[in-house]
Amino acid sequence: MTRQFVFSSESVGAGHPDKMADNISDAILDAILRTDPKARVACETLVKTGMVVLAGEITSHAVIDYTQVARDTILDIGYDDDGIGFDGRRCAVVLALTEQSPDISQGVDEGRGQDLEQGAGDQGLMFGFACNETDTLMPLPIQLAHHLTKRQAEVRKTGQLGWLRPDVKSQVSVRYEGLRPVALDTIVLSTQHDEAVSQATVREGVIEEIIKPVLPTHLDTTGIRFLVNPTGRFVVGGPAGDCGLTGRKIIVDSYGGTGRHGGGAFSGKDPSKVDRSAAYAARYVAKNIVASGLAEVCEVQLAYAIGVASPVSVMVNTFGTARIEEKRIECLVLELFDLRPKGIIKMLDLVRPIYRNTATYGHFGREEPEFTWEKTDRADDLLREAGPAAA
């Protein structure tokens, strides 16, 4: 009997305090990479009422005004007035930045350390995931959740709903039959708003201008619930309402709870950090496996040891949907993809100032050209090398 269940995923917009922190960290990374592609960057951000703290390790010859980068990012997000909880022009910016530890750098720099190749910047495990339930080979709940937060930002910036403020969260619950999404169950959207607007106006505006334009037409919406600002009020938002930290929305950044996560955050880290680059590579591998038709669902785990170039393990799980043995797919992955840090960086062209754009609306399932890990250019190679057994 086919199992029926409801699965939920959430997204948060750039005005959410944790996403503000991610945006600032990645904006600083981009500013450095524009001048120094060999930089080592691990930049963490904390935001709270009237204050930004930048802390971490940065080794670079780039001369960057970190304070101004933080301010510009905050203003771009929309926090430009103390009346809405934060003003990027007036907030304090505290710097606590040092250089990367030499004990770490000797294992990362090519030609140094026990493994003379460029080694992983840390130990750890990373997961990539793909499934065939959407055109982007992403799980539907997280894709719709991102569409909602992105739509809120568009409506706010155009002035279509003039009472919207930057902080926003969405959550989408989808009903499944087996592996197939069949119906929308519940949509939650909580958006910061001006104090004077009524909740009736907020509810009507959100449903008509934000939610309905992004609902897919191929799913059953009979009995769908819309929960708009379910507390009844959302005036205090952003850092005035909650402290924000880089890396605290790693499930929003990835697959919305579908598939697993190794625990390492992405934002503020240059691509020598496998927390980021290997997670992108794992998505690239998983997506190409599904795009090739070798499996309907695929999860890839990569694991690394600090200072060692090659992954210590590579695992493919297709949840019973593969057309050939999973062990054979693992062998194909090792044959066709260079999963050493240097190989990943070259394969995906990661030494570029592309990271601020990843900090909101997810790192995966995006169609912008800089998201090279979303290409399916190795699908034909996988299918060809799989041989007649995959036909």
From Swiss-Prot:
Pathway: Amino-acid biosynthesis; S-adenosyl-L-methionine biosynthesis; S-adenosyl-L-methionine from L-methionine: step 1/1
Database matches in InterPro entries: ADOMET_SYNTHASE_CS, S-AdoMet_synt_C, S-AdoMet_synt_central, S-AdoMet_synt_N, S-AdoMet_synthetase, S-AdoMet_synthetase_sfam
Residues that coordinate or bind L-methionine: 57, 100, 242, 273
GO cellular component term, pick one: cytoplasm
Chain residues that bind ATP: 16, 167-169, 233-234, 242, 248-249, 265, 269
Superkingdom to which the source organism belongs: Bacteria
Cofactor note: Binds 2 divalent ions per subunit. Binds 1 potassium ion per subunit.
SUPFAM superfamilies recorded: S-adenosylmethionine synthetase
Compartments (UniProt record): Cytoplasm
Root EC class: transferase
Positions annotated to bind K(+): 44
Sequence positions that bind Mg(2+): 18
GO MF term list: ATP binding; magnesium ion binding; methionine adenosyltransferase activity
E.C. numbers: 2.5.1.6
Cofactor (UniProt): Mg(2+); K(+)
Keywords carried by this UniProt record: ATP-binding, Cytoplasm, Magnesium, Metal-binding, Nucleotide-binding, One-carbon metabolism, Potassium, Transferase
Function recorded in the entry: Catalyzes the formation of S-adenosylmethionine (AdoMet) from methionine and ATP. The overall synthetic reaction is composed of two sequential steps, AdoMet formation and the subsequent tripolyphosphate hydrolysis which occurs prior to release of AdoMet from the enzyme.
PANTHER family referenced in this protein's UniProt entry, alphabetically: S-ADENOSYLMETHIONINE SYNTHETASE (PTHR11964)
Protein family according to the UniProt entry: Belongs to the AdoMet synthase family.
Quaternary structure, from the entry: Homotetramer; dimer of dimers.
Name used for this protein in its record: S-adenosylmethionine synthase
Species the sequence originates in: Mesorhizobium japonicum (strain LMG 29417 / CECT 9101 / MAFF 303099) (Mesorhizobium loti (strain MAFF 303099))
